[in-house]
Amino acid sequence: MLTLTPTYDRPWRQPAEWWPRLAAATDGIDPPFGVLSLEALAANAHDMLERAQGTPIRVASKSVRVRGVLDAVLALPGYHGILAYTLPEALWLAETHDDVVVGYPSVHRAAIAQLAADEKLASRVTLMVDSIAHLDLIDAVVAPDKRATIRLCLELDASYHAPVLGHLGVRRSPVHTPEAAGELAAQIVKRPGFALVGMMGYEAQIAGLGNRGAGKAVIRMMQKASAAELRERRGAAVAAVRKVADLEFVNGGGTGSLESTHADESVTEIAAGSGLFGPLLFDGYEHFRPAPAASFVLSVVRRPTADIATVLGGGWIASGPPGQDRLPRPVWPEGLSYLPREEAGEVQTPVTGAAARDMQVGDRVTFRHVKAGEVSEHLDEFVVVSGDEIVDRLPTYRGEGKVFL
């Protein structure tokens, strides 16, 4: 298993030396593959702990999708448990981990039946709910008297209803007020076959929205106001739910909100994962800057003109509102850019720039992805580099034959 030892060197701050070093270490491997710097991963993991200031971090698996990385991070004091994104994934991870919360409601009937039939799995996995309809579906799959007790987490809507701008954040739970949370909790605890053990609220408008630069002053103001509003509302909602349920945990936040979520006394743990890989998305944040721990490498397969080199693959567009900010970025060799009329393609991606003129068929281009775990869906493995050497090769979920979404 990888050991994530703290490091005080920051070689990635010299990109003209950093990227060639990683490229040289992996020169004998055929693309496409991911590259994971052990030092950068360790620095990010420890930086997140410092930012959380003692609040335990539950690792968001969707932002990693590499079991070897999950294992290494969870071995560090300060990290505990996994926030999975589907129930089939959670059941798979629960074979070796004893605390897995599914971050989204599940209606996967076969997986629910598997969970309900296994006391050990049922003790390790917690399902997310935000309405009685979720309980009804579970009961329809397996009756309460014919299954193990199902652990539940109630999700609170953590979005911000701004005075002028309206709804800010993501559309998740319909449970927005403390009153609604208390009412749903009261209904849940009356239902046989269930145990309400947790609460969750994800403040995407704070954790997932870049705020760096003079043009982002309004966003920073909104985030400050949202954090204050949520701290009061979430605290009241947790208090309302605790009147009827003995909660084991209250989960909040994400990599981008570790500081503000820690300041909420009602929160007992923070969910985070993207900061481990340090994707492009976080280059746009003012209050922290993770190391670019994860990258991916593609091969040059064509030279259509003297100014253009074409790599195989590349169109690994990040989720979210479509735009230029969702494209992977070529980072080595320096100075490469996309063609405006073609950009990143499904099977081939032409790049241009001064460096493209010197590239030959068989050369490589290193890219960074906008998001963290999404790149793992395109790769079989990450090659782990420490210093100038390959120290491990870790399969992604895809490399292990698993595709959950």
Write out the residue ranges for each language-model feature.
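Glycine-rich tight-turn/loop motif centered on a GG-T
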Residues: 26-37, 99-102, 120-127, 166-175, ...
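C-terminal accessory subdomain/extension
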Residues: 303-405
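Active-site loop ensemble at the mouth of alpha/beta enzyme cores that anchors a bound cofactor
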Residues: 214-226, 235, 256-334
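Active-site-proximal beta-alpha core segment in soluble small-molecule metabolic enzymes
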Residues: 60-203, 208
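Flexible loop/turn segments at secondary-structure boundaries
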Residues: 66-68, 93, 206-208, 257-260, ...
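A charged N-terminal "starter" segment
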Residues: 1-117, 400-405
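Flexible, glycine/charged-enriched surface loops at secondary-structure junctions
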Residues: 56, 196, 243-249, 359, ...
